[in-house]
């Protein structure tokens, strides 16, 4: 196998190819096009264009192959895999993800038993549901609201992700689902907090099919066409170089050959997800007090109902038509401080509970409800790293410390009652009781490299996402979010990345102007 040629020096080195890392590449391509950018991704390219969502792969076998190749250092090429979290005590990973093998639960703690990762170009954005709601109430970041920046950054995030609310407008039962939910939920809500269409990173092609956004959409043609941008897949960054207290580049290993190279850089952006970003900083000897702390996930409760008064849509031959979310769309019940959970309602491909053989579900008639709960933030909830043991990539092994507080248990109990109430408004429950997913199932890990206004030991980075005490080093992704959120965090994570990327672009262009 030929040796890969890495650049000796670039202006910006980006670690990770998910939406946040892609945001840095896109903003820099737009605002500082002369800057040389190298993006490093430990996983392989599994879709075309690189970073595209696997849902856009029409062939089912090819799509499954792409998912398997995303499943980490021990990914299999064959069909011998177990996927999909089910209603059991087993630890299982969704297709396209792989579980933390050990260290997911400390003795006497709740842990995150199904904490998971994806290793592929595009990260989890090649496998996600695409929900992009804006944060509300205490989910919002106060110091960015005070400057009037947050909503503009969120709007920019929506542009980059290709967020729409009309992709499912033709869904025959979407309006009915919203009407039934609104009838029991909207009376006590402000107008912008009422039941509504879910903002989604998806659009519908003129010829009909849906196209789901991945990092390919965030990168866009401008980044792919930028001669100064290069994406290196199957490239493991093992250390951030620091000289005279400032980030100076990265050490990268070619996963295919094992060869190691130093790549010098003026700026380093670590966007490796909320667990592997602090892992890389730790491995580099960059260890602020808050690193890995304030880890938070969203407890997830699910419930399924059969829609009342449901008539399947049929084609010209009388055959029922179906497809994920094509009947009922995706409905959003926003988080509020009074109702501290985020609701997502959509058609299920199939019932999560086996129906009687003589009572088959009409295609599209089964609606799934999910409520995501905001976590009670605790500094003791953290990811710690070993100085001796390593993971499958040879990086410091993780140990998660995670405990639900009394407040968390109360929120979950309240959400269980709420989801039954909402479900009964739509249809007839398939099960009397809602199901609490294993902790970690949301995949919405946050807080481990959190943003703050001051270097006070309670945050890792500044509002520009620059790591305290390590100029030139930036962190990106959901781990930067400093608040407890119940909504899907991707849009917020991208919005914060926009601010950091603009800061780097401004520094680069200012330097060029001074020459």
From Swiss-Prot:
Residues binding FAD, per UniProt: 41, 118, 120, 124, 129, 131, 237, 478, 490
Catalytic residues (UniProt): 444 (proton acceptor)
Cofactor note (record): Binds 1 FAD per subunit.
MF GO annotations: flavin adenine dinucleotide binding; oxidoreductase activity, acting on CH-OH group of donors
One Pfam family named in its UniProt record: GMC_oxred_C
Source organism, top-level taxon: Bacteria
Catalysis: reaction(s): isoorientin + O2 = 3''-dehydroisoorientin + H2O2; mangiferin + O2 = 3'-dehydromangiferin + H2O2
Keywords: FAD, Flavoprotein, Oxidoreductase
Cofactor: FAD
The enzyme's E.C. designation: 1.1.3.50
InterPro entries membership: FAD/NAD-bd_sf (IPR036188), GMC_OxRdtase_N (IPR000172), GMC_OxRtase_C (IPR007867), P2Ox-like (IPR051473)
UniProt region (Disordered), positions on chain: 62-90
Bias-annotated ranges (Basic and acidic residues): 62-82
Job of this protein: FAD-dependent C-glycoside-metabolizing enzyme that participates in the degradation of certain C-glycosides by catalyzing the oxidation of the hydroxyl group at the C3 position of the sugar moiety. Shows oxidase activity toward C-glycosides such as isoorientin and mangiferin but cannot use carminic acid, puerarin, orientin or aloesin. Shows weak activity (100 to 1000-fold lower) with O-glycosides. Probably plays a crucial role in the metabolism of C-glycosides in nature.
PANTHER family reported in the protein's UniProt record: PYRANOSE 2-OXIDASE
Homology family: Belongs to the GMC oxidoreductase family.
Subunit record text: Monomer.
Name of the protein in question: C-glycoside 3-oxidase
The species this protein was found in: Microbacterium trichothecenolyticum
Lineage: Bacteria, Bacillati, Actinomycetota, Actinomycetes, Micrococcales
């Amino acid at each position: 196998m030929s040796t890969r040629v890495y650049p000796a020096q670039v202006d910006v080195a980006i670690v990770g190819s998910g939406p946040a890392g892609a945001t840095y590449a896109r903003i820099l391509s737009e605002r500082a096009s002369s800057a040389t950018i190298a993006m490093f991704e430990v996983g392989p390219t599994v879709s075309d264009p690189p970073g595209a969502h696997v849902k856009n792969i029409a062939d089912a076998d090819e799509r499954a192959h792409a998912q398997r190749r995303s499943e980490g250092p021990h990914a299999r090429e064959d069909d011998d895999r177990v996927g999909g979290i089910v209603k059991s005590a087993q630890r299982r990973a969704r297709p396209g993800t792989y579980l933390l093998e050990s260290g997911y639960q400390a003795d006497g703690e709740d842990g995150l038993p199904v904490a998971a990762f994806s290793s592929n170009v595009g990260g989890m954005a090649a496998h996600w549901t695409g929900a992009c709601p804006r944060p509300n109430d205490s989910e919002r970041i106060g110091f960015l609201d005070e400057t009037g920046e947050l909503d503009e950054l969120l709007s920019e995030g929506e542009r980059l992700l290709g967020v729409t609310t009309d992709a499912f407008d033709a869904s025959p039962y979407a309006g009915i689902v919203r009407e039934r939910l609104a009838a029991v939920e909207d009376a006590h809500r402000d107008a912008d907090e009422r039941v509504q269409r879910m903002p989604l990173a998806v659009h519908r092609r003129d010829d009909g099919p849906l196209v789901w956004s991945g990092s390919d959409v965030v990168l866009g043609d401008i980044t792919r066409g930028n001669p100064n941008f290069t994406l290196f897949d199957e490239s493991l960054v093992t250390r951030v170089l620091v000289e005279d207290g400032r980030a100076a580049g990265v050490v990268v290993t070619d996963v295919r050959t094992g060869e190691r190279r130093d790549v010098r850089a003026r700026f380093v952006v670590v966007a490796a997800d909320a667990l592997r970003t602090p892992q890389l900083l730790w491995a580099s000897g960059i260890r602020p007090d808050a690193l890995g702390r304030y880890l938070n996930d969203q407890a997830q409760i699910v419930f399924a109902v059969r829609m009342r008064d449901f008539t399947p849509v049929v084609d010209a031959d009388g055959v029922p038509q179906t497809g994920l979310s094509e009947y009922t769309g995706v409905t959003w019940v926003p988080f509020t401080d009074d109702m501290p959970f985020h609701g997502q309602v959509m058609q299920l491909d199939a019932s999560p509970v086996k129906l009687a053989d003589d009572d088959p579900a009409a295609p599209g008639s089964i609606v799934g409800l999910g409520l995501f709960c905001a976590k009670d933030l605790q500094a003791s909830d953290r990811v710690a790293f070993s100085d001796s043991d390593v993971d499958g990539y040879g990086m410091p092994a993780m140990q998660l410390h995670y405990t639900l507080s009394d407040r968390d248990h109360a929120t979950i109990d309240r959400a269980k009652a709420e989801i039954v109430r909402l479900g009964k408004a739509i249809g007839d429950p398939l099960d009397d009781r809602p199901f609490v997913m294993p902790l970690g199932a949301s995949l919405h890990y946050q807080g481990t490299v959190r943003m703050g206004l001051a270097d006070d030991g309670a945050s890792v980075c500044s509002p520009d996402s620059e790591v305290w005490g390590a100029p030139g080093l930036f962190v990106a992704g959901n781990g930067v979010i400093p608040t407890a959120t119940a909504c899907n965090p991707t849009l917020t994570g991208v919005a914060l990345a926009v601010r950091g990327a603009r800061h780097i672009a401004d520094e680069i262009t200012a330097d060029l102007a001074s020459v």
